[in-house]
């Protein structure tokens, strides 16, 4: 039967997405202008719900296309203006530069990071110790790098391990070509392969949680941290200090959770590395060490020095985060002899789709600002006083971040609280405390689902997920103990007064200085 033009259109529209999803998006595009004509406020909220729906369906279709179409239509029918969208992009240029340059910069440091993580797995035999090392190492790296970058590195490590084992177990040598996605090789022991997959799933989930534990601590750990820091006019060290009353107890709670789930082998954890696999990986590491040339050793040394520059540059805020990332690209490529344009271009492939998606987020944020969608919610939350207000903001951010991307949630809330500050509804000191509640609320409970954390979504949609049988449901189940512990410890740190008391102590000892409203007004604003 010949294909009609309408069938061809539906087939082409959003590619391989399910038909019901395509119809849903087309329905949204038809309904939205009608609702906007009848009631702009309801239409605005409908757009936000639709956009969250596209994020939740990220595995069916990358959210850039359906979310982007909704955003374009919103601008076209007057829900916001192109100038307001551009203003949002302008206000968040540093975040865009972080994603473009920092993620690409770390691409050129992968050799060093692969070397370090390989040593961890081959030298340490205790699964509990390896799990803790992966979790802590990911947390440390995420405090200085974007969590997406860290997960990208650890995925590369896991794919490397998997392909090495698969190749040797299929009867080939390290140097042979091999398709590690095919399990049709009769030499493969399925029990061994299944156990190894479980082991890699465990390590990737511990590393993913580690990125959340470290990412919440500093202004560069997650994109929304940078947005919050810009609105509050905080620098690197001040941001880390203000977060510490919540982030330090949460970090230790996370590490204890890592130990307990491995010790008692619950929620899918506790999978051991089979002895045969360990032997293969150790032999590979020895093979690499034996064949490492002076050129290779110099490259590792250069990457270590660049890593040191990265930490120092960020800690002392020697330049904006994106520019430090650009300097990493230039130095890592110049001193390691990477001068081919195509080789450099590969570094940008991982982050640019997400950067484009972030630009669409800001278009939706522009609609929220112009239609004043969050004003009733914010006014309700602000009607409470002191500590209760902080707890409500933490919970409100946390619940929304579980189903929607935390960059989106954090951006919306900090913009609204900033507006309340500039209109005189709250004091500057209360604004600073609310900024901490918003940052921790968006970062910690969002580990619940891949929708909330960009790094988790990146892991779920990566090449490694199908190889190690890591599905959406399995990720949610494995993240559950962490979700419960991190969320509860975070809310208790605020509810029991640790945040207010420690912040006051920092003021009293002059480790922190009070900011004025003028500081915030002078900071980059989304209004």
UniProtKB/Swiss-Prot annotation:
Gene Ontology CC terms: plasma membrane
Its membrane topology: Multi-pass membrane protein
Pfam families: NhaB (PF06450)
Described purpose of this protein according to its UniProt entry: Na(+)/H(+) antiporter that extrudes sodium in exchange for external protons.
Protein name, UniProt field: Na(+)/H(+) antiporter NhaB
Major subcellular location class: membrane
Origin organism lineage: Bacteria, Pseudomonadati, Pseudomonadota, Gammaproteobacteria, Alteromonadales
Key words, A-Z: Antiport, Cell inner membrane, Cell membrane, Ion transport, Membrane, Sodium, Sodium transport, Transmembrane, Transmembrane helix, Transport
InterPro entries, per database record: Na+/H+_antiporter_NhaB (IPR004671)
Compartment(s): Cell inner membrane
Membrane-crossing segments per the record: 28-48, 52-72, 97-117, 130-164, 203-223, 248-268, 304-324, 349-369, 390-410, 448-468, 476-496
Reaction equations catalysed: 2 Na(+)(in) + 3 H(+)(out) = 2 Na(+)(out) + 3 H(+)(in)
Listed GO MF terms: sodium:proton antiporter activity
Family named by the database record: Belongs to the NhaB Na(+)/H(+) (TC 2.A.34) antiporter family.
């Amino acid at each position: 039967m010949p294909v009609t033009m309408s069938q061809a259109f539906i087939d082409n529209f959003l590619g391989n997405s399910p038909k019901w999803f395509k119809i849903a998006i087309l329905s949204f595009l038809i309904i939205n202008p009608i609702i906007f004509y009848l009631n702009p406020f309801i239409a605005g909220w409908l757009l936000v719900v639709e956009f969250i729906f596209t994020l939740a369906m990220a595995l069916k279709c990358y959210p850039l296309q359906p979310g982007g179409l909704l955003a374009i239509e919103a601008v076209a029918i007057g829900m916001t203006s192109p100038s307001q969208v551009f203003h949002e992009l302008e206000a968040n240029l540093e975040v865009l530069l972080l994603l473009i340059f920092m993620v690409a910069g770390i691409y050129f440091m992968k050799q060093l990071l692969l070397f370090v993580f390989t040593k961890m797995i081959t030298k340490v035999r205790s699964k509990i110790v390896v799990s803790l090392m992966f979790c802590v190492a990911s947390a440390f790296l995420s405090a200085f790098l974007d969590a997406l970058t860290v997960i990208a590195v650890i995925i590369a490590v896991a794919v490397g391990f998997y392909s090495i084992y698969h190749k040797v177990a299929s009867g080939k040598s390290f140097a042979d070509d091999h398709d590690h996605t095919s399990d049709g090789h009769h030499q493969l022991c399925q029990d061994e392969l299944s156990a190894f997959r479980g082991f890699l799933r465990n390590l990737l989930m511990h590393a993913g949680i580690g990125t959340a534990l470290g990412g919440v601590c500093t202004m560069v750990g997650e994109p929304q941290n940078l947005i919050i820091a810009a609105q509050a006019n905080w620098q690197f060290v001040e941001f880390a200090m203000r977060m510490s009353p919540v982030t330090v107890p949460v970090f230790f709670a996370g590490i204890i959770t890592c130990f307990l789930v491995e010790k008692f082998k619950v929620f899918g954890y506790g999978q051991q590395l089979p002895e045969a696999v360990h032997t293969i990986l150790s032999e590979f590491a020895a093979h690499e060490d034996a064949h490492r040339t002076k050129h290779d050793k110099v490259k590792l040394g250069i990457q270590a020095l660049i890593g040191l520059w990265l930490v120092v540059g960020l800690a002392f805020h020697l330049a904006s985060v994106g520019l430090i990332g650009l300097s990493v690209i230039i130095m890592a490529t110049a001193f390691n002899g990477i001068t081919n344009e195509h080789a450099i271009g590969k570094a940008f492939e991982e982050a640019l789709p997400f950067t484009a998606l972030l630009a669409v987020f800001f278009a939706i944020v522009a609609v929220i600002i112009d239609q004043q969608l969050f004003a009733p919610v914010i006014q309700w939350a602000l009607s409470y006083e002191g500590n209760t207000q902080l707890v409500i903001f933490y919970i409100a951010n946390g619940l929304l971040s579980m189903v929607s991307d935390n960059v989106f949630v954090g951006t919306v809330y900090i913009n609204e609280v900033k507006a309340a500050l500039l209109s005189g509804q709250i004091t500057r000191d209360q604004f600073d405390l609310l900024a901490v509640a918003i940052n921790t609320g968006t970062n910690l409970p969002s580990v619940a689902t891949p929708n909330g954390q960009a790094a988790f979504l990146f892991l779920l949609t990566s090449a490694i997920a199908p190889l190690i049988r890591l599905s959406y449901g399995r990720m949610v189940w494995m993240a559950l103990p962490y979700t419960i512990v991190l969320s509860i410890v975070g809310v208790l740190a605020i509810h029991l007064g640790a945040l207010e008391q420690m912040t006051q102590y920092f003021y009293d000892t002059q480790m922190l200085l009070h900011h004025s409203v003028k500081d915030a007004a002078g900071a980059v604003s989304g209004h």
